[in-house]
A protein has these predicted regions:
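Bacterial N-terminal signal peptides that target proteins for export
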Residues: 2-14
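Ser/Thr-rich, low-complexity intrinsically disordered terminal regions
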Residues: 26-207
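C-terminal motif of bacterial Sec signal peptides marking the signal peptidase cleavage site
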Residues: 22-24
Length: 207
């Protein structure tokens, strides 16, 4: 594939880049269908990860837990954009791949890439082998809900992706990080939160 093929490069949301991409090589509708199929599959896995790992309970007062959650996000390099102790909401973001390290992102991408390519191949054939995940041009958004509950405080984390650079094409955007990246990120949030809780004399979170 020559310069024309290289000029076909497209990015689709969370940083789906098809290296010599699909511009004049594959119909726009086909490209859109391919990315939307990946969106559906990864959304299902995303919801499974949050359902099994996203919520825990802390046996401590709400103000203590709220401040520990806030400190957790800051410690992981996130910028707090919105917080309301009354509503129990904290929203923070950071350029991708944080809160993952570059090595963690690469590990997650390697785990999820075979499935993404298999889904893409149904629509674009061998061009799916040029498909990869990259974090550039994206931010990771963490939403934390910190709510009083009988016996303590319930904490829930959600991790989404937002495009911060203007898209270079009209391809559909991906809203979900690779599922393995979500699992790694959520686990990292809990590990950091538990350290913060211990530093405040509170017990760690429990499932």
């Amino acid at each position: 594939m020559g310069r024309d093929g290289a000029g076909c490069m497209r990015r689709a949301g969370v940083a789906l880049v098809v290296a010599l991409a699909l511009g004049g090589c594959v119909a726009q509708e086909t490209r859109r269908d391919a990315v939307e199929e990946i969106n559906r599959a990864f959304r299902a896995e995303y919801e499974t990860v949050l359902g099994t790992r996203g919520t825990r309970v802390v046996a401590a007062a709400h103000p203590v837990v709220f401040e520990a959650v806030r400190a957790t996000l800051v410690q992981l390099g996130m910028t707090v954009r919105q917080e309301s102790p009354g509503l129990g909401l904290i929203t923070a973001d950071s350029p991708a791949p944080r809160p993952l390290s570059p090595a963690e992102w690469e590990r997650a991408a390697a785990a999820d890439l075979p499935k993404a390519r298999a889904l893409l191949a149904r629509h674009v054939g061998a061009l799916a082998n040029l498909f990869t995940f990259e974090p550039e041009g994206l931010s990771i958004v963490i939403n934390a809900n910190v709510l009083e509950t009988p016996g303590g405080t319930e904490v829930s984390f959600a991790m989404r992706m937002r495009e911060v650079d203007a898209p270079k094409s009209d391809m559909p955007r991906r809203e979900y990080p690779p599922p393995t990246a979500v699992a790694i990120g959520i686990d990292k949030l809990w590990e950091t939160l538990d350290r913060e809780l211990r530093s405040r004399g509170a017990a760690p979170s429990r499932r």
